[in-house]
């Protein structure tokens, strides 16, 4: 019985504690559409900045922009994984300088639950954080 205990202790000592896991990542789904077909400018956050100073120094590094043709039956949908969606989840859609913008709509869902929705003429912003 003594050798079994010694063997178990050796196995524990050799393997050591389990490796530390990274932060829990949340599925964040952005959805944007408009009342009429329109080429929208969409900015979104797809990664957690390491800290606010890095984000503040160059926010566009962490907020890609795409142009997407959206409409009532043609939403733009993207799911990203963020560790801190309460700080960093954000999507905004704008009409740029168009003289005839549609009404934009956005939703932001975290782990399948819609937590923010918004709409507006010329653009819409969905974020958990007040900017």
Predicted regions and their residues:
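Secretory targeting and sorting signals
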Residues: 1-20
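Short loop/turn segments at connectors of secondary-structure elements within structured domains
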Residues: 14, 24, 38, 100-102
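A broad, low-specificity signal marking well-ordered, structured residues that form hydrophobic/aromatic
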Residues: 18, 28, 124
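Short, surface-exposed binding/anchoring microloops in extracellular/periplasmic proteins
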Residues: 21-56
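Mature extracytoplasmic domains of secretory-pathway proteins
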Residues: 45-98
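Extracytosolic low-complexity repeat regions of secreted or lipid-anchored proteins
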Residues: 75-128
């Amino acid at each position: 019985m003594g050798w079994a205990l010694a063997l178990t202790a050796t196995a524990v000592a050799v393997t050591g504690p389990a490796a530390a896991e990274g932060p829990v990542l949340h599925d964040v789904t952005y959805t944007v559409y408009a009342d009429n077909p329109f080429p929208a400018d969409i900015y979104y956050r797809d990664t957690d900045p390491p800290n606010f100073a890095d984000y503040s120094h160059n926010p566009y590094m962490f907020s890609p922009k795409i142009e997407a043709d959206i409409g009532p039956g043609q939403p733009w949908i993207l799911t990203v994984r963020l560790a801190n969606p309460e700080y960093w989840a954000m999507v905004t859609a704008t009409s740029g300088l168009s003289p005839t913008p549609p009404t934009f709509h956005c939703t932001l869902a975290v782990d399948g639950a819609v937590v923010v929705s918004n709409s507006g003429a010329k653009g819409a912003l969905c974020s958990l954080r007040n900017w």
